Amino acid sequence: MRKESIYEAILNDIMNASISENYKNKMLKNVMRLKAQKMNIMITGATGCGKSSTINAMFNTEVAKVGVGVDPETMEIRKYELDNLVLWDTPGLGDGKEADNRHTKNIIKKLSEVDKNGNALIDLVLVILDGGSRDLGTAYELISKVIIPNFGEGKENRILVAINQADMAMKGHNWNYDRNKPNWKLVNFLEEKVWSVQDRVYEATGIIVEPIYYSAGYKDGWGEQSRPYNLSKLLYYIVKAIPSEK
């Protein structure tokens, strides 16, 4: 049942999108490809950006344990599977030089792995940024110094950047909690952040990314659950980037 909820969200978003029929058909073929072959996606970012919450939202169930408070939950790369969709949840960077060095080596090792056919194991890397943070230096270093140099051929088409916690981008201000969406001031702020991230990544790597923003939703320390926002857009973003062949 959970598999259907993911695919239905993707298909509904494609069918309702204001895109040409040719492009719509291409996206539908990508969904079929996702169903037919195993797709490995690495999810990475700085500590506290919401990687585990994003995985839980995508799977529509609590498969990844979310850290509460100051301690990050993910300390090693963890694998989560839902049929042909395989997500690799990496430890967050930014918790100290020694830990970062260890995590970086593990990320590089995973990026270097190949499948039984000799192709790169990791098909896509999704870098998640914390929309509520002004300091994104750790994430930019991760992209420019770890992922780009170690991701092999076609990397310019296989790196996705998504800004999580859109609801907290202005410290919770200008978010309509009843309708679970940003008002126009926050939309403008988020759009400016998208352009800023795009510029920073291009300056550092020469690669053009097209960031999106969303909110995975999360459970706080008291078990209160907030609703996801723009999750279907995140799924659509991933489907759009699926390689045409392994």
Where is each model-derived feature located?
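Conserved G1/Walker A P-loop phosphate-binding module
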Residues: 1-95
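Conserved GTPase G-domain signal focused on the G5
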Residues: 50-51, 217-246
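Short glycine-rich substrate-engagement loop in P-loop NTPases that contacts/grips substrate
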Residues: 70, 97-107
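Flexible beta-alpha connector loops of hexameric P-loop NTPases
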Residues: 92-101, 182-187
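Conserved C-terminal guanine-recognition region of P-loop GTPase G domains, centered on the G4
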Residues: 106-206
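Acidic carboxylate-rich catalytic motifs and surrounding loops in phosphoryl-/glycosyl-chemistry enzymes
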Residues: 207-220
